[in-house]
């Protein structure tokens, strides 16, 4: 699998990161995974900027706007605000409640 990496840096330190995958690598749709923002940077809204950059990278690199991700349940509203909608049932991944979400 070949991921593209979206990296956010501040003062030469990585503070935000995602991996993006072309359609068919994980899901039928393009996908975003491993969304991480350093704890001390979360209040600065870098998660929103990181996701916007990741969505844009998928649209440019893979020429699609249909994107799927596996979200931790407590972040459902965050992803809703970015245009993602729930698909399927809640499930556990590593003991943490998750939900599938798609953006069209």
At which residue positions do the language-model features occur?
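Short secondary-structure junction/hinge motifs that connect adjacent elements
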Residues: 1-5
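Residue-level recognition of the GNAT/N-acetyltransferase active site
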Residues: 38, 72
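Conserved catalytic-core motifs of GNAT/GCN5-like acyltransferases
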Residues: 68-70, 80, 85-100
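Conserved GNAT acetyl-CoA-binding A-motif
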Residues: 51, 58-71
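Conserved acetyl-CoA-binding loop-helix of GNAT-fold acetyltransferases
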Residues: 37, 43-56
């Amino acid at each position: 699998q070949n991921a593209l990496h979206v990296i956010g840096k501040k003062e030469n330190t990585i503070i935000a990161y995602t991996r993006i995958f072309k359609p068919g690598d994980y899901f039928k749709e393009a996908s975003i995974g491993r969304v991480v923002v350093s704890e001390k940077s979360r209040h600065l809204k870098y998660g929103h900027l990181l996701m916007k950059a990741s969505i844009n990278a998928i649209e440019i690199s893979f020429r699609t706007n249909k994107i799927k991700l596996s979200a931790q349940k407590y972040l459902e509203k965050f992803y809703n605000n970015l245009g993602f909608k729930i698909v399927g049932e809640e499930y556990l991944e590593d003991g943490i409640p998750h939900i599938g979400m798609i953006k069209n």
